[in-house]
């Protein structure tokens, strides 16, 4: 089925993002657009510092405090994300409906917390499941993303995982 026949689940049109720095406005993103359709994977590529992370963080309400969307529109499931003003608003979709896997998984994982607990917290927050059932689901997620010996790995810290394994843990959390 051609994309023209379907509605995108995420549509960004002519998005502009600026940052305030020492009293000046710094334009970081100018007229950037994309459509993401159900069941598709989208990769955003570009040179280091070109704005990929800034652009995608705007979909999750995760811009730095001095950053703001200054133009264009971002629609998710037909809802205008510009109307999401508070953290409470963003928590209705962040992690539940939209997630992002960063290139460096160490920036997404707490180095002081065991891997299993981090996955459990995501399950508790996003699905409302706690205790032994959350632990069981966390172990299943580790297995599902190809982490060998999930019972042992559940008790380990991020620094005890390879980079590729950490990235799979972040995918399990997402």
Where are these regions (language model features)?
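ABC transporter nucleotide-binding domains
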Residues: 1-174
């Amino acid at each position: 089925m051609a994309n023209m026949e379907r509605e995108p689940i995420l549509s960004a049109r002519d998005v502009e993002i600026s940052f305030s720095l020492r009293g000046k406005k710094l334009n970081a993103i100018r007229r950037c657009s994309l459509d993401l359709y159900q069941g598709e994977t989208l990769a955003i590529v570009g040179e280091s510092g070109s704005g990929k992370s800034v652009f995608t963080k705007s979909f999750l309400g995760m811009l730095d405090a001095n950053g703001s969307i200054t133009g264009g529109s971002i629609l998710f499931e037909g809802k205008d994300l510009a109307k999401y003003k508070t953290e409470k608003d963003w928590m209705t979709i962040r992690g539940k409906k939209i997630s992002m896997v960063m290139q460096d998984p160490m920036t997404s994982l707490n180095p002081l917390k065991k891997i299993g607990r981090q996955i459990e917290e995501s399950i508790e927050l996003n699905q409302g499941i706690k205790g032994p059932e959350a632990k069981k689901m966390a172990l299943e997620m580790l297995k599902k993303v190809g982490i060998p010996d999930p019972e042992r790995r559940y008790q380990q810290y991020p620094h005890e995982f390879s980079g590729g394994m950490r990235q799979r843990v972040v995918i399990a959390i997402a």
